[in-house]
Amino acid sequence: MALPVLVIGRSGSGKTYSLKNFKPEEIGVISVEKGRLPFKSEIKVIRIKSFDSAEASPAQINVARYSWIKSVIKQCKTKSIVIDDSQYLLANELFDRANEKGYDKFTNMAANFRDLIHFVNELEDDDKIVYFLHHSELDGDGREKVKTIGKMLDEKLCVEGCFDVVLYCQDNKFFTQANGQSVAKTPEGMFELEIPNDLKFVDTTIRDYYGMEENNTKEDKQK
């Protein structure tokens, strides 16, 4: 099975910047909203495909959008993939379906997002890691949690519970455990409590911990 990893943090905290130490052949980036990286790089960024159509309902458009993402993840040749920023999948669907009445749409939104995570978990590729870069917000206890679109969705889905590895990014650092400040969590002994916001280091450490194939270029392997 592939491994989904969640990275949460406020805008500008260093989530996307953490990709800087990857080489272009090592990482694929699916951009939901932005089209460029915050540093100079030859890493390929794929903008999410537009499915706007007068003949399709907003619900159908969003199903097509998620299906396209799943297809890209499955076909991508890199061992590591990033979805940046994944919370816009929820936010954009909310705006797309703003004219729909009733609560069923919130259940649909939660199901679409959950199914994407489950797709990664069930993908028959033991060496693939998919990173969900996601904005955070404060919960009722004052901790940073996954930003969703309100209590209606939170009641349907605990996003953090779908991941074994959740990192909290703040001030260009990753925090790996819930210390009262966030909902971060990682397996015992995988990381120190505080590490640099270097997703390449995270990727290498996770692969070593779980015995996954290394994600290195041919030049690196020959050294």
Feature locations, PLM:
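Conserved P-loop
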Residues: 1-76, 80-82, 88
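Short, well-ordered coil/turn elements that cap or connect secondary structure elements
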Residues: 24, 40, 125, 160-161
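Conserved beta-strand termini and adjacent loop/short-helix elements that scaffold enzyme active sites
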Residues: 48-51, 133, 169
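P-loop NTPase motor core
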Residues: 80-158
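Conserved GTP-binding G-domain of TRAFAC-class P-loop NTPases and closely related GTPase folds
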Residues: 138-223
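Hydrophobic, Leu/Ile/Phe/Ala-enriched alpha-helical segments that form helix-helix packing faces
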Residues: 72-76, 120-124, 163
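Short, well-ordered beta-strand core segments
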Residues: 27-29, 130, 166-168
